[in-house]
Amino acid sequence: MNLRVGFELVFACSQPTPMLLMLHTHAAHANEVLVPDRLLVGPPLPLTHYHDAFGNYCSRLITPPCGFLTLSSTAVLAVAGDPEVPSLDSYQSPVEDLPDECLQFLLGSRYCETDLLSNVAWQMFGNTPLGRPRVQAICDYVHRHVVFDYQQARPTRTAFETFREGVGVCRDYAHLAVALCRAMNIPARYCSGYISDVGLPPPYAPMDFCAWFEAWLGGRWQAFDPRNNAPRTGRVLMARGRDAADVALSNAFGPTPLAKFTVVCEPDEEPESLAVRAVASMQG
């Protein structure tokens, strides 16, 4: 299936303000790209790029002194047209056998307070089977316990606060599940990106960026989604990190309120028409 992903973000500017951006599809999808994303900036501004400590592709710019800054992008990827299939490699590695790069994802972080949730985690999940069944039990619990409510979203809510309040949005589901996994000695990292509604019945909510997490099982990272808690078709990663603080779509070092926000993640046309768009993208 060809999947088109993209966005348009408009920020109101009142002074030149440095910004850091994580708005590209992740390199993990390199073999699926039909039309690569390209970050368009209006008005045109100098733009530089770098990779952060987690391997995410990031951009830097300074906003105009006044008016509006528009950031947009679109990409087309060839993704599996069927719902995700859970991996059969689901064993849980003892801490002493984990790769060095996994160890940081066992520790508490800004939004994932493992110290406050450790006793709770062991009380609830200490008797569950190791590996995928334990992670799935955590996802099942988070999915039942947290009520999704955009109206009660706040950017400072932590995993422990989500546990106490029982309400949140997709990032809160992911933070709580990540913290509980880490408390059970399962490395877990936070992910952000796109998830399509392909295969779901209408009505559809307005498209938004999404959050899920990956757990280290079977000797590799595997995706879990406590918000939806069901296989989905068309999941596209943008960034990974310890929690949402590491993968913010934009970090502005000054006042830049968001004036417009649209996200697209939907099936696209057949490959022959993509060639025309690819040429146009390179020429533009």
Describe each PLM feature range:
Residues M1-S90:
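Intrinsically disordered, low-complexity N-terminal segments that are enriched in acidic
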Residues L21, V41-P43, T63-P64, V79, ...:
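Generic structural "secondary-structure junction" signal
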Residues H24-H26, S87-E96, R227-P231, F253-P255:
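Short intrinsically disordered coil segments
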Residues P44-T48, V95-L98, P231-R240:
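Short, surface-exposed linear segments at secondary-structure transitions and domain or protein termini
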Residues D140, D172-K260:
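Hydrophobic/aromatic-rich core segments of domains that either
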Residues C13, L77-G81, S87, D97-G168, ...:
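Secondary-structure boundary elements
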Residues Q15, T25, L45, A75, ...:
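A broadly conserved detector of short glycine/acidic/proline-rich loop/turn motifs that flank catalytic sites
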